[in-house]
Amino acid sequence: MKMAVKPLDEVKDASKILAAIKYKSFAKAFFAVKKWTDPKPLGFDLELMPLTDLSNVHVGDMVHFDVSFMGKPFSCTQDTIQYMTATSNTFGGPDNFSLYSYLINGKAQFRMPSAGQWVVNVYVRQDVNPDGKLKELVGKCTTVWYAGTISFNVKP
């Protein structure tokens, strides 16, 4: 084993460590059997929900998403620019372009430019401090990263 996961309070001389990260990832893939039914939230810390029938998306269609963090709509603030990305190996060729949509009132949307498999992502960074929501992690890590992902296919 080359690496082991340990909380800061179990590391000798942890004062030399600049950052310790806890990573929480949530992923969903959507498809329909016979017909699309609107999915229900699963209660993830970072929840991405499609507001569009993802079983029948074609090039040029708009797809809409609802994003919540800790049960509340996740949005841009005056301090942060929150956004959702969309990527596909069929868009951008070797340059690997991505689409970006700002999260406003917990909503994001994209007009799909190419057919193929697409992945949308949202990342959230929360610093750990004694006065914050993550105070139980003080001494164990410095930052918590949340990742939410949805994959779906776009038809020609």
Give each language-model segment a name.
Residues 82-99:
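Short amphipathic beta-strand segments in non-cytosolic proteins
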Residues 80-82, 118:
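Short beta-strand/loop motifs in extracellular/secreted proteins, especially
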